[in-house]
Each structure stands twice: as structure tokens, then as C-alpha cells.
Regions:
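Active-site loop and adjoining helix of the penicillin-binding protein/serine DD-peptidase-beta-lactamase fold
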Residues: 2
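Glycine-centered, phosphate/nucleic-acid-interacting loop/turn motifs that mediate DNA/RNA or nucleotide
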Residues: 31
């Protein structure tokens, strides 16, 4: 039984035949595979190795906040869960493992600053660095002023920073004045 990106769908195994399907069920009983959501199973060893295929678990989900800050190395804090942004009106059943926190956004805010990256062999959607800084400012009271300040300092220390793009995103996300005040103090 081959695993594609550490995930197995029961439908693809059924196509291979009854024997393959029973082997998959036996692997679940023995603890080698874990049910992520209905019809999708994952290899335990590969899940614990690092990044998981978020697209398989939550289609069209975008890594945001702590997960995105970690990917872009904007903070030294490690995320306790995968933070995934989805459309506000969408309902998604989240599996018990891996731990995923959903953040709901309106469709016009959701699409600002989305890029695709390949991380540990998985193609994932994630917010770009400028959007991540704006999110840190927007949610500064929830994540803490110290984390927000660390993210801004790290961003400003990078040679590839793009202040005009940052301010454009900040205006769209309605944090332009607040971010402007931070930048006046920091620069």
C-alpha cells in the first residue's frame, strides 16, 4: 500500500481491490495509520515528521498567523497547532489530529497576499511576509504586543522588505494607521 504525501484515501485503496482495503483497515487497527477525516488516513510516522498536507485535510485552506510566521521565520515562538484561514461562510470538520485552528475571513480579505510554497514536499498556500506582518498588527491584542513587536523588528531587519507593499496591505486590512505609528517608532 503506497502513501502519497503520507495520506491515503479509502476510495483509492478500494480501487486497488478488497485485499488492499483490508490491509489498510488492519494498519488502522494496529495504529500504523490514523483516521484524519472521513475517508482519509495518514501515516503516523510521516505526520510527526513536520509539515502535513493541509490541502488534503482542508481544501483551499491558507496557512496564517503562527504557522505562517513560523514558515517565514518572523518569530521564535513555535505554533501549537496549524492555523488555517478559510472563507467565513464555509463549514469544515476539523480532525482531532493534527491540531488545527480555523480562522474565518471574508472572501475579499482572505485572498490578500496568498502565495504557494513547497514545504517538506507539500505544496501549501500561505500568506506572504507582508500580510503576516499586517496580521500580527491586526491581532496584536490576542497574540501579545511582544510577539507583534518581534515580528515587525524581524521584518524591518530583512534586506528584501517591501514597505510600500506592506502599507498597501495594511490599508486593505484596516491597520494602516496603527502600522504607520509602529513604523515611525521603529525606523
Amino acid at each position: 500500500m503506497e502513501t502519497k504525501n503520507s495520506f491515503i484515501s479509502s476510495a483509492s485503496v478500494k480501487v486497488q481491490g478488497r485485499t488492499a482495503y483490508y490491509k489498510m483497515l488492519e494498519a488502522v487497527r494496529q495504529g500504523e495509520l490514523i483516521q484524519v477525516c472521513r475517508g482519509v488516513y495518514a501515516n503516523i510516522d510521516q505526520l510527526s515528521a513536520g509539515m502535513v498536507d493541509i490541502e488534503s485535510i482542508i481544501p483551499n485552506g491558507i496557512l496564517c498567523l503562527w504557522s505562517a510566521w513560523n514558515i517565514h521565520q518572523l518569530t521564535t515562538s513555535m505554533p501549537q497547532a496549524y492555523h488555517v484561514a478559510i472563507k467565513r461562510d464555509r463549514k469544515v470538520k476539523v480532525p482531532s489530529f493534527p491540531k488545527i485552528e480555523l480562522h474565518h475571513y471574508t472572501s475579499n480579505i482572505l485572498e490578500i497576499g496568498v502565495i504557494e510554497k513547497v514545504i517538506d514536499g507539500f505544496k501549501v498556500k500561505v500568506y506572504d511576509v507582508e500580510r503576516c506582518v499586517c496580521d500580527a498588527v491586526k491581532f496584536r491584542n490576542k497574540v501579545g504586543i511582544d510577539v507583534c513587536s518581534e515580528i515587525i523588528d524581524t521584518y524591518l531587519s530583512r534586506p528584501e522588505r517591501n514597505i510600500s507593499k506592506l502599507m498597501d496591505y495594511a490599508r486593505q486590512l484596516r491597520v494602516g494607521n496603527i502600522l504607520g505609528n509602529y513604523l515611525q517608532v521603529k525606523l
